[in-house]
Amino acid sequence: MSEPDAPTPLDPAELGFERIRYEKAPPRATITLNRPEVLNAFDFKMLRELARACEDASWDDEIRVVVVTGEGRAFCVGADLRSWGAELIDNPRLYWKWFGAFKDMHDRLREIGKPTVARVQGIAVGGGNELQMACDLAVMADDAFIRHVGPEHGSVPAGGATQWLPIFVGDRRAREVLFLCEEIPAAKAAEWGLVNYAVPRAELDAKVDELVEKLATKLPQTMRYTKQQLNWWRDISWHETVGHARDWLSLSMLNDEAKDAIRAFLASRDDG
């Protein structure tokens, strides 16, 4: 598709997405990660499609709220390590480009200019938790959990977690989440402020609908600037560190520790 002449929103069908579903029912747009066979893990194309959907939603004045969710039993489990193992190990230049797409997706989502709600219907691991933290509000099914596994799999969780977890849950709890790599049940995630609500699965959509209905009544320009002011806390930590993280993680693709950890994880999946 050629580049548009103006910031004109499109019908989702015109965008031809393959890795996500993008739906508009004003005042709501819904972005659904749609790779359930790999627990909605990010590959390069998904990152690009997410960024483009966020751009389109930001251009559409009929859209007042954006909901982000996943298809199947996972919200998102972060990066697709199979694509990493096949393409990025021993290839820091390609990883640098991959992380650029990841960063661009996050920037588009945070700077979308309207409230966003994460509908966390399943597990959120690694970059999946970073994705829900990039949203303004989050509602989580009470049988789901959040977990970070970077220190076990050879990847520093610097795509949002090292920057934002201390803001969300405090420094000590952030270290607990990232160092121990243990599951954080939905109830604890809500208690800690990592999500806003943990609700029974049968009530998940009703709670999301309630938030969307309330948010859609607010003045859009005032909401946009309120969001921008609140984003200062996240943005300052993000912009001060993410460039360094991109370079360091790229070089880590040459490191035996990272390579061995990724290969061991992939071997365990194959054995399972």
Q: What are the language-model segments listed below?
A:
Residues 107-221:
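Crotonase-fold acyl-CoA enzyme core
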Residues 78, 99, 103, 126, ...:
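Glycine-rich phosphate-binding loop at the start of an alpha helix
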Residues 31, 35, 50, 68, ...:
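Terminal peptide-recognition signature
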Residues 52, 104-107, 210, 247:
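Generic recognition of well-ordered alpha-helical segments
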